[in-house]
Amino acid sequence: MDRYQATFERLAAQKQGAFVPFVTVCDPNPELSLKIMDTLVKAGADALELGIPFSDPLADGPTIQGANIRALDSGATPDICFDLIGQIRAKYPDLPIGLLMYANLVYSRGIENFYQRCAQAGIDSVLIADVPTNESAEFVAAAEKFGVHPIFIAPPTASDETLKQVSQLGGGYTYLLSRAGVTGAETKANMPVGDMLAKLEQFNAPPALLGFGISEPEQVKQAIDAGAAGAISGSAVVKIIESHLNEPDAMLTALANFVSNMKSATQK
């Protein structure tokens, strides 16, 4: 059984949803980034969603763009990122680990090489933010060849046809957008997502995790009450990193407290 499926089944048995934090690997530097990822898991994260630093993150607001810049300034390369992820994989063999990234980074290594490297690092899924389902064939083929789940975004404005493609092509989980626009904790997630979830279920989609604008435990609870399998929080996590750059111990404590509070909101 794959790690996402095993995790969702374990959580369902415990009457819990999943809480999944997002960080950019190597933010603010490789050494501290490893401690950050470790802290997130120890504090109760059910899976990790990770960004590979990129100089032009289109769908991201200023918070995650800042994380990309810090990581690149610290000397981050995809190889360093894969190495750090491999260390987390070795320590947490059952943890689902996903990448959220952009097509340029995949193309620059060659599509097959990229997914092969993901498989070697123990990565379970890859979501390419700027590749819609109708342009995804070569990515999906390479992902499946190397046992990596392709993840797709179900946006709130999606047609039934798009949701059907997202459901059929995706594996692992479905990234359900709570609203259109760029990422950021300032802009609140807007429910209801019930209609979207009903359609995804009708099309037999992988379990849905709600993302974009999730920054408070109450929103996690709302997402799960609406029928989502869990919630992803990115900008709110990265903001904690950003506001404690000169005090790493306080940063790790604040991250642990945030994850712990968000995770406790997943209990049904």
Curated annotation (Swiss-Prot):
Annotated EC: 4.2.1.20
Top-level taxon of origin: Bacteria
Catalytic activity: (1S,2R)-1-C-(indol-3-yl)glycerol 3-phosphate + L-serine = D-glyceraldehyde 3-phosphate + L-tryptophan + H2O
Function field: The alpha subunit is responsible for the aldol cleavage of indoleglycerol phosphate to indole and glyceraldehyde 3-phosphate.
Organism: Vibrio vulnificus (strain CMCP6)
Protein name: Tryptophan synthase alpha chain
PROSITE patterns: TRP_SYNTHASE_ALPHA
Enzyme kind, highest EC tier: lyase
UniProt family annotation: Belongs to the TrpA family.
Signal peptide coordinates: none
Coiled coil: none
Quaternary structure, from the entry: Tetramer of two alpha and two beta chains.
CDD domains noted in UniProt: Tryptophan_synthase_alpha (cd04724)
